[in-house]
Amino acid sequence: MQNYQSHSIKVLKGLEGVRKRPGMYIGDTNVGGLHHMVYEVVDNAVDESMAGFCDTINITLTDEGSCIVEDNGRGIPVDIHPTEKIPACTVVLTILHAGGKFDNDTYKVSGGLHGVGVSVVNALSKRLIMTIKKEGQIYRQEFEKGIPTSELEIIGKTKSAKESGTTIEFFPDESVMEVVEFQAGILQKRFKEMAYLNDGLKISFKEEKTQLQETYFYEDGLKQFVKDSAKKELLTPIISFKSMDEETRTSIEVALAYADDYNENTLSFVNNIKTSEGGTHEAGFKMGLSKAILQYIGNNIKTKESRPISEDIKEGLIAVVSLKMSEPLFEGQTKSKLGSSYARALVSKLVYDKIHQFLEENPNEAKIIANKALLAAKAREASKKARELTRKKDNLSVGTLPGKLADCQSKDPLESEIFLVEGDSAGGSAKQGRDRVFQAILPLKGKILNVEKSHLSKILKSEEIKNMITAFGCGIQESFDIERLRYHKIIIMTDADVDGSHIQTLLMTFFYRYLRPLIEQGHVYIAQAPLYKYKKGKTEIYLKDSVALDHFLIEHGINSVDIEGIGKNDLMNLLKVARHYRYALLELEKRYNLLEILRFLIETKDALSLDMKVLEKSILEKLEGLNYQILRSFATEESLHLHTQTPKGLVEFNLDDNLFKEVLFEEANYTYQKLMEYNLDFLENKDILAFLEEVENHAKKGANIQRYKGLGEMNPNDLWETTMHKENRSLIKLKIEDLEKTDAVFSLCMGDEVEPRRAFIQAHAKDVKQLDV
């Protein structure tokens, strides 16, 4: 084993300022920063793996709120540091920029700076425990907010002299971090990615709270990565290869395949860090791939059709490019783009040689790849011709604009906005109600084409899509120019029903796939048309959704209730909490039935700590008190099953740990505890939810509450006042927070693969909170 001792740890400077400006080190103090702390510790263990000294990493999220990261690497050095005169492991945990990665002999490649990460994590943790197994001994040291609270001490011996490794357990400090509760879903994705990129590394992940336990291990990680990334059927086998350039100490690994898809999905990494903006390695990959395939087509296929270009090679491509290099040069602090110039030539030559060889040795697969490129070229030419139809001679001339477009008078894009309105009826109301100076209206007939299932050549034949592209003025694909955008606000305005939601989704899919910069630069919005209209006498109020309606009913209903012992504002706040409690209960009832039992479990003190047999007896007594007939009841140590006859019919109820782990159950329990913080003596033993209903009924008495299904039901003035007037309206700006996750959602929900969508719907059907049928 290579010698890894205190002299390998280089020291730069102390930890001053980390707690004052944590965002400089972990990005932010919210969800992203919290999980970045985990990655920093895990990355150190992965670096041990890349150096060849670790093959197992265990990560545990504990019930106490801590994260434990354990590896079987060499263990951080414990001998006295030559310049700091304290144990080297203490230096690594307490001094910024102290780590083995500044010593080129310790780590040939690394994702970051060893010691920077773990010392920052220490500074931002209210408590951190370091345990090291090294040279037959087990060492331990504790820290609080980056400061040692104990000396490094020997607490035992290892089972064997060869056993080694480092364990870090840290508790995020809530006085610095806005969020301290880890989210398993975020971490799972990253750990799986790490296992893909490091053949033979076993990463085990456990969450004690949910008893989740997963292990990620791949013998041929990149090939599996490509296979798992494919959303549609693969047309070719997965091609994979790797190489090591000794001169630059750069390892290159590539895996790719072609799928029956129009979209490209190329992922690139440097030292396990995702380079989402690409860089020289990704450019080199595409250069080498294009050169090999285009050369093959030129030498082997005669065609009178359009010749493919590099752009055509990308259609249907799924690829992962992973580099491990000693001193990568990144552009910017985020490390999302590689700038090392020599990487382009290295990757390009390797990819060209390997793909050229594959095509020569596999004529059937070569023909499939060539035909895919030829079809893409043909479609590109058809799209080019179709695009010409959407171009105008003059960007602001109305002469070539769609006939259905009611344009605005202003020619200033900064103040101009266009409403994409569902149907001619609503379009008519919008045209009459708008401010003609700066508001344009484009009615859309029916549901537009689902672009996820269509090629661009077909998309550009769609009348509604052509009208939108022409109206926007910015073009599409390679002719796209955001400087020519005629409206800086594009507002989707649809009915508040299932069809309206579908049209919104189709439009969002179109914008995401073909006009993504409009979303990224904040030009696309969704109008929040009111769902309800409350009318009583001369009072007319428009309400956005059921929450707004309930709050309005509470605020106006209490005026008709004579209550002593509680102030009006306190009563209003209490009833809003009660409304939230009722909502959580009703959502739970959809899954578990018997609202009465759910309330009993939440509202009965210590009910959740009772033995299941004792709990069964209490529940049966409760149901019998309600005159429900118990038909069958069966309890084990862990669950209760019963059938009972209620006024609503025969009901089955199953009780086990799954109920108590439900987020909605926790929400209901939390809101009930909030209710109990109020003095409820004024109710005189009346049920709080019954009182809430009484208050709401007072507000409803003599009132007409209309639920809008369509914008066409509103007269032009109402539509203007509620949805289009800048002073009154509510708009939602579209944002893309996680590109990969967004891409996956559109592919799943809007693509032509039925089975994954069916499975998703079946898995999440009970989670639906607003179903319009």
From Swiss-Prot:
The keyword Transmembrane does not apply. InterPro entries: DNA_gyrase_B_C, GyrB, HATPase_C_sf, Ribosomal_Su5_D2-typ_SF, Ribsml_uS5_D2-typ_fold_subgr, Topo_IIA, Topo_IIA-like_dom_sf, Topo_IIA_B. It is an enzyme of class 5 (isomerase). Its main location: cytoplasm. GO terms for biological process: DNA topological change; DNA-templated DNA replication. Mg(2+) 2 binds at residues 495, 497. The keyword DNA-binding applies. Mg(2+) 1 binds at residues 422, 495. Its EC number is 5.6.2.2. Disulfide bonds: none annotated. Residues 416-530 form the Toprim domain. It is found in: Cytoplasm. The record marks 447, 450 as: Interaction with DNA. One of its GO terms (molecular function) is metal ion binding. Keywords: ATP-binding, Cytoplasm, DNA-binding, Isomerase, Magnesium, Metal-binding, Nucleotide-binding, Topoisomerase. PROSITE patterns: TOPOISOMERASE_II (PS00177), TOPRIM (PS50880). Binds two Mg(2+) per subunit. The magnesium ions form salt bridges with both the protein and the DNA. Can also accept other divalent metal cations, such as Mn(2+) or Ca(2+). It catalyses: ATP-dependent breakage, passage and rejoining of double-stranded DNA. Its cofactor is Mg(2+); Mn(2+); Ca(2+). Heterotetramer, composed of two GyrA and two GyrB chains. In the heterotetramer, GyrA contains the active site tyrosine that forms a transient covalent intermediate with DNA, while GyrB binds cofactors and catalyzes ATP hydrolysis. Few gyrases are as efficient as E.coli at forming negative supercoils. Not all organisms have 2 type II topoisomerases; in organisms with a single type II topoisomerase this enzyme also has to decatenate newly replicated chromosomes. A type II topoisomerase that negatively supercoils closed circular double-stranded (ds) DNA in an ATP-dependent manner to modulate DNA topology and maintain chromosomes in an underwound state. Negative supercoiling favors strand separation, and DNA replication, transcription, recombination and repair, all of which involve strand separation. Also able to catalyze the interconversion of other topological isomers of dsDNA rings, including catenanes and knotted rings. Type II topoisomerases break and join 2 DNA strands simultaneously in an ATP-dependent manner. This is DNA gyrase subunit B. It comes from Helicobacter pylori (strain ATCC 700392 / 26695).
